Amino acid sequence: DIQVLCPSRKGELGTVSFNKKLQEKLNPPHEEKREVVINQIILREGDKVMQSKNNYNLPWSKEDGTCGEGVYNGDVGILLEIDKREGTLIVQVDDKLVLYTMESASELEHAYAVTVHKSQGNEFPAVIMPMFPGPPQLYYRNLLYTGITRAKDMVILVGTERTVYTMVENDRKTRRYSGLYYFMIGEAEHEKAEFEK
């Protein structure tokens, strides 16, 4: 199984663009494949999909009759069946058949290409990473390392040597200023004042 890993979702080399193009090539429309549009995304039988957030209530079953609930952020599977009359989709995730309603299917996204961030915790036999110039806050050493280490057997870097060099040299992740530190200090001071009353 080959997985394309991108630094971001947006842009010409982001997952949104790649997924559209890869779906067209790898799973084009066919009269025998049912499809449905959810969140402006065409989901088609045979699509490679990923669960976008934890859902502890999605029912699943296994071939041996075992049943349970729960599918997790980052789980990848194949969309096997769309039943528009019943309003359900069946996705095979590893050895489980997961039953989605049209509403819960909004938690699915294409997984022909995923972000490096979203791929964390997964391994793939082969990884392809587009390596073209982009924003420095997305192109840093740890991102490259994370992407490469998702591959079990093979990594293919497609793009420019310069981009790879830039990523290797960029060992600083952009600092984010969320205000969380100041919020936590304020909360701690408030709690201390309440405690001392």
Residue map of PLM features:
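Conserved helicase/translocase motor-coupling segment
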Residues: 1-71
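C-terminal accessory regions
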Residues: 73-197
